[in-house]
């Protein structure tokens, strides 16, 4: 944790210690963090891998029962010696808390970042052009995200990726990036992405007449204690959009909401 962390400063309180030295009582003032209070502080100020000078890259997955947001930055990896997509965090809202609440949670978490860089690259595909089941209202999902982010003071570069990439292309690109053999490499903050990592590890593959694809059959099942919504494939879909967006669309025209073509 950095020494000048604002969250630590906010949770630090003055206390008094009393001891006896040479037969005399000595009272000393000292400052110490309230660690119970620190546990409640959930913002990006505690993230050591966040680069304050760089923009954020963001993608969502939209569903009736669970909505996901996955956030990253692109910068040089010490491990690979080249640029990598650093997956900083993932978060979700479930059941009665929908997409708008998720964007609000995301803003609360990343609000301190706006002091240094308020630019967000928001990647979305045709799945974001639906409405209804992930929100209360009749706006497209992408419009809700853009509206909320701008309301909170973010400069949004909305990048329309068009139709989702083919499963074979996503599978190949992501596996090669995870293996460190193709750009952009992937590095994941394990503490901030626990559910996402488990979901990625649990994701299976279905093989049909159109080739192989991600097995998303569990998304239709009722949530149970041993099979919670956050450990299913929904979060991995948001991760896929983020990765493919960074790989193929990162250098699109800033601020232009136009569908782009996949670069084969």
What are these regions (language model features)?
Residues 1-59:
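ATPase catalytic-site recognition across NTP-hydrolyzing enzymes
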Residues 9-14, 20, 243-264:
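Acidic two-metal-ion nuclease catalytic site recognized across multiple nuclease folds
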Residues 51-75:
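Gly/Thr-rich phosphate-binding beta-strand-loop-beta motif of the actin/hexokinase/Hsp70
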Residues 61, 124, 238:
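Short, conserved catalytic/metal-binding motifs centered on acidic residues
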Residues 64-65, 74-76, 127-129, 193:
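Short, glycine-/Ser/Thr-/acidic-enriched flexible segments
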Residues 82-224, 249, 262:
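Mg2+-dependent endonuclease catalytic cores in nucleic-acid-processing enzymes, primarily RNase H-like
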Residues 221-233:
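Short, flexible active-site recognition loops that position polar ligands and cofactors
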Residues 235-243:
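Glycine-rich phosphate-binding/hydrolytic loop that grips phosphoryl groups
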């Amino acid at each position: 944790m950095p020494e000048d962390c604002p969250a630590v400063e906010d949770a630090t309180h003055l206390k008094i210690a009393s001891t006896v030295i040479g037969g005399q009582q000595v009272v000393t003032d000292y400052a110490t963090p309230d660690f119970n209070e620190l546990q409640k502080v959930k913002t990006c100020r505690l993230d050591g891998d966040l680069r304050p000078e760089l923009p954020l890259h963001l993608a969502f997955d939209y569903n009736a029962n669970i909505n996901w947001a996955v956030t990253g930055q692109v910068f040089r990896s010490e491990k690979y010696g080249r640029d990598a997509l650093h997956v900083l965090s993932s978060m979700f809202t479930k059941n009665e808390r929908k997409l708008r609440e998720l964007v609000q949670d995301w803003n609360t978490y990343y609000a301190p970042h706006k002091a240094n860089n308020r630019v967000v690259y928001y990647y979305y595909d045709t799945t974001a052009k639906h409405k209804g089941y992930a929100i209360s209202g009749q706006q497209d999902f992408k419009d809700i995200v853009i509206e909320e982010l701008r309301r909170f003071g973010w400069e949004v570069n909305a990048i329309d990726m068009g139709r989702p990439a083919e499963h074979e292309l996503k599978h190949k690109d992501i596996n090669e990036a995870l293996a460190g053999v193709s750009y952009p490499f992937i590095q994941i903050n394990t503490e901030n992405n626990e559910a996402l990592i488990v979901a990625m590890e649990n994701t299976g593959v279905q093989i049909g007449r159109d080739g192989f694809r991600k097995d998303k059959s569990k998304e239709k099942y009722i949530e149970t204690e041993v099979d919670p919504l956050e450990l299913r494939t929904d979060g991995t879909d948001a991760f896929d959009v983020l990765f493919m967006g960074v790989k193929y669309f990162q250098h699109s025209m800033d601020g232009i909401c136009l569908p782009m073509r996949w670069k084969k």
